[in-house]
Amino acid sequence: MSDYENDDECWSALESFRVKLISVIDPSRITPYLRQCKVLNPDDEEQVLSDPNLVIRKRKVGVLLDILQRTGHKGYVAFLESLELYYPQLYRKVTGKEPARVFSMIIDASGESGLTQLLMTEVMKLQKKVQDLTALLSSKDDFIKELRVKDSLLRKHQERVQRLKEECELSSAELKRCKDENYDLAMRLAHLSEEKGAALMRNRDLQLEVDQLRHSLMKAEDDCKVERKHTLKLRHAMEQRPSQELLWDLQQERDLLQARVQELEVSVQEGKLHRNSPYIQVLEEDWRQALQEHQEQASTIFSLRKDLRQAEALRTRCMEEKEMFELQCLALRKDAKMYKDRIEAILQQMEEVSIERDQAMTSREELHAQCAQSFQDKDKLRKQVRELDEKADELQLQLFQTESRLLAAEGRLKQQQLDMLILSSDLEDSSPRNSQELSLPQDLEEDAQLSDKGVLADRESPEQPFVVLNKKHLSQTHDTVPSSSEPPEKERRRLKESFENYRRKRALRKMQNSWRQGEGDHGNTTGSDNTDTEGS
């Protein structure tokens, strides 16, 4: 706006035009703009406009320039902008540039009606911009909501992934624990098997020792029986030995026989003398025959005794062999019985071991079946949980999609409502303005009262009535959407009437403000012309 950066240079450049500025400017006309630019506070404005010491307009302008000079470069720029808006010719003289804002020129050229038309056009443009910005804002809100929905979906998926990771970690920990337990059980089973094998080996050794002791006991019993038999034989032999009386009788018979033999020998010696006698010869022959027979009988007896002794020896040997064979047979029978009992015990143990093995295998198969069934049930439950999680995620996704569609529908509904408002405003712009000019005098007093109350609010936020009207229209449309009893023509007519009332009131307020400013400008212009002529 200015070519000067230093405050002193800015205001020193305006000192040459101070007399012209004081003579032309009306402080009541530019103070609202200066206050809007925040270079003039309400106290300064009250001092400039309402101070009883400042009755003359030129003194008011001088005080205003002094106040603005204290604000520095910002006050200088705001003052030049106010000159550009309200005093374009003076701005051209001071800066040597053409003003870019031509509000006062429009007032001078086309009058108040042209200014009103221009203001209405600008208001409509601003309203259209507000509508576009509102639509853009709604679309951005919808996009933000969609992003929030996507963010919630992403968070849901992240939570699900985290939950799956936690489940995987828990499953891996449980699998590791099961493996450790299985390893411990296998180790315990191996130790128990080793202990069982050691116990079986000790049992077998003890059984062998018992069998050996039993065999030794049986041998001792057999030896005892053999000794008992020998003892019985000796006792029987002692019992069969001849008695002492029989021995004495046999001894007497032997003595008698010896005496007779001696007598016979004596008689034989005596009979040698009478050998030649026939009687003696006969006796000798008889004696020889008897002796020969006796010798034959003795040899026969001797042979028979020899045979008897041999038979008795053979009989004794056979009896001994028989007894030995009987003892061997008894020992073999006992050994066979022992081995039979041992085999039966081993077979019984094998049957018991096989029964225990079958029971262990059956219990192991049952445990495996139970474990497999539990794993299947666990897998089924996990599958059901996973399916339920997927269903929940799908339902939540459908809920989010429904919410996004609902938000999109609301955005489209808002856009349609804004389009309807734009269409109604276009229809109002195309309608003849003479009806408005005819209806202006009728509502002038009422609108003047309303304008006096709401002029400050209109200056601060010119878009607020349109927003309120838009909110009313949205509320009406939301109220009328569920109830389809009212026709759309009636709703459009109501909207058109409310918008016409708003435009009428807005135009009246603008016209009153422009009339007041025009009267002040006219008086100031005449006064400035008089002062210029006087100064010239």
UniProtKB/Swiss-Prot annotation:
Binding-site positions, Zn(2+): 3, 10, 73
Domain CARD: 6-98
Activity modulation: Maintained in an autoinhibited state via homodimerization in which the CARD domain forms an extensive interaction with the adjacent linker and coiled-coil regions. Activation downstream of C-type lectin receptors, by phosphorylation by PRKCD and/or ubiquitination by TRIM62, triggers disruption of the CARD domain-coiled coil interface, CARD9 homooligomerization and BCL10 recruitment, followed by activation of NF-kappa-B and MAP kinase p38 pathways. Zinc-binding inhibits activation by stabilizing the CARD ground-state conformation and restricting its capacity to form BCL10-nucleating filaments.
Phosphothreonine sites (modified residues): 231, 531, 533
Pfam families assigned: CARD
Residues modified as Phosphoserine: 2, 277, 424-425, 431, 451, 461, 483, 498
Example GO molecular function: protein homodimerization activity
Renumbered residue ranges of the record's region Linker: 99-116
PANTHER family for this protein: CASPASE RECRUITMENT DOMAIN FAMILY (PTHR14559), CASPASE RECRUITMENT DOMAIN-CONTAINING PROTEIN 9 (PTHR14559:SF3)
Name of the protein: Caspase recruitment domain-containing protein 9
Biological source species: Rattus norvegicus
Name of the coding gene: Card9
